[in-house]
Amino acid sequence: MANTPHGGVLKDLLARDAPRHDQLAAEAEILPALTLTERQLCDLELIMNGGFSPLEGFMNQKDFDGVCENCRLADGNVFSMPITLDASQKTISELKLQAGSRLTLRDFRDDRNLAILTIDDIYRADKQKEAKLVFGGDPEHPAIKYLNNTVQEFYIGGKIEAVNKLNHYDYVALRYTPAELRVHFDKLGWSRVVAFQTRNPMHRAHRELTVRAARARQANVLIHPVVGLTKPGDIDHFTRVRAYQALLPRYPNGMAVLGLLGLAMRMGGPREAIWHAIIRKNHGATHFIVGRDHAGPGKNSKGEEFYGPYDAQHAVEKYKDELGIEVVEFQQVTYLPDTDEYRPKDEVPAGVKTLDISGTELRKRLRTGAHIPEWFSYPEVVKILRESNPPRASQGFTIFLTGYMNSGKDAIARALQVTLNQQGGRSVTLLLGDTVRHELSSELGFSREDRHTNIQRIAFVAGELTRAGAAVIAAPIAPYEESRKAAREAVAGSGGNFFLVHVATPLEHCEKTDKRGIYAKARRGEIKGFTGVDDPYEAPANADLTVDVSKQSVRSIVHEIILMLESEGYFERL
């Protein structure tokens, strides 16, 4: 028999409201509508299917305050993470929202109506309270950054009536709702289930620790990875799910099942661990593995951990009696080469040789194509990871040249394009400033805002091409540090590699060699907002390479760029 849901009853709103579907669908068409963000969609799905039981909607102020201050809903149930629906004052005013209003919640991906929210209250988001009490207060924490940079100024609280399920087109058979997973466990005859949460690929050590946990408790294993929103830079869920599927046959037959969880993680450490335990309880698990630094975001810019290594375990232990799910404390396992086995580190006798490969080392080996031993991971898993994470010699990159007009960046870009084409191995795309202005940004002017927009368009194109394995050479003026930083983040965020080259040719040289007389026109006032004349150029603070055409030949500069790429592994090494 599966575990009792949190709060006693599974709040499966989809099943509850199915008899009224036609009525609710018709009403949703005529109500004011709010189009949800990706994170809001993840939250809504788990509200509607009961994954967030006992919630029946987005939190009102009483629930929000109780969760932030005491880890409890207003009804007294333990709940550790604020589940809120944020909206701007502009949206609230335009839709004429107030307490008692009914609001359609819409999917941004396909414009489908998913639910109707009856508004209980609209309250100002106390971001400072949420940041401090829920996430610890460090402004570098990703959840706090999201609060400060993305979340709107008001929260809308109220209960949900479900209209339609979210559409998914990937791994549909593995996306069990809590009710479906409970039925599946019952069909298999499972009464004791250890749930394992992960946002990373699984290797031999993970298989070993989950089997050990199941063996000690005479239980089965639910591999329950997150496929919603995880930490930026994580391996994509498509790759991870293929790797989980490849790993599954390595378990004893009938021991483990794989189910996917469309959760938007907050990387909230102790608070998140409690939340994860509640979610797994709602999915029918009786036991939940909580690891070292569970759901922690890593380190801040000072190299400090956001949470203590065992804070998450202590937090779940504090509420274990009320949570109603047994916590299995993750004991890190290590490989013993002399006996070809894995053991928990605290069970290894002194002096016995052990081997480990860190996540950083694994990423390095994937990047360079170095050997990944079978004692660490299974060949079928490594094969999948290599397919999605090719070595650098097969990856794309963006060379972003910035400098004054006539600094020589266009000449460098063209020469570099020829050199890379001769090198072969990847397609090469050239994005010169004038070309982009003509083809992509013809409607933009030269205000600071328009210049920023132009650079972001270049970054978007560069990121998509780089992710597909191409070499991109961009050569805009890009005078503002803010725009260049955003461009780097955009390319890196899409999985690409970005190199900023500052063509630091002095302004005097650029003017002196200007055969088109454009600087002269700007000096006479015939051209306004001209970089270097009446608009500033902010020199890069973090260029990967700085060159100067007044002191170096184009050929030598291109050679410097090639050497930089070679040193980073972007060309085949014999």
UniProtKB/Swiss-Prot annotation:
Organism for this UniProt entry: Aspergillus niger
Q: What does this protein do?
A: Catalyzes the first intracellular reaction of sulfate assimilation, forming adenosine-5'-phosphosulfate (APS) from inorganic sulfate and ATP. Plays an important role in sulfate activation as a component of the biosynthesis pathway of sulfur-containing amino acids.
Site positions for Induces change in substrate recognition on ATP binding: 330
Instruction: List the Gene Ontology MF annotations in alphabetical order.
Output: adenylylsulfate kinase activity; ATP binding; sulfate adenylyltransferase (ATP) activity
Residue numbers spanned by region Catalytic: 170-394
Matching entries from SUPFAM superfamilies are given as: Nucleotidylyl transferase, P-loop containing nucleoside triphosphate hydrolases, PUA domain-like
Q: Which family does it belong to?
A: In the N-terminal section; belongs to the sulfate adenylyltransferase family.
* Subunit structure of this chain's protein: Homohexamer. Dimer of trimers.
Q: Which residues does the record give as sulfate binding sites?
A: 197, 199, 295
What CDD domains does its record include?
Answer: APSK (cd02027), ATPS (cd00517)
Could you give one GO CC term from the UniProt record?
A: cytoplasm
Give the domain section of the comments: The adenylyl-sulfate kinase (APS kinase) is non-functional. It is involved in allosteric regulation by PAPS. PAPS binding induces a large rotational rearrangement of domains lowering the substrate affinity of the enzyme.
Q: What is this protein called?
A: Sulfate adenylyltransferase
GO BP, one annotated term: methionine biosynthetic process
Positions that bind ATP: 197-200, 291-294, 333
What is its subcellular localisation? Answer: Cytoplasm
- NCBIfam families xref list: apsK (TIGR00455), PRK05537.1 (NF004040), sopT (TIGR00339)
Q: What class of enzyme is it?
A: transferase
Activity regulation: the record says: Allosterically inhibited by 3'-phosphoadenosine 5'-phosphosulfate (PAPS).
Q: Where is this region: Allosteric regulation domain?
A: 395-574
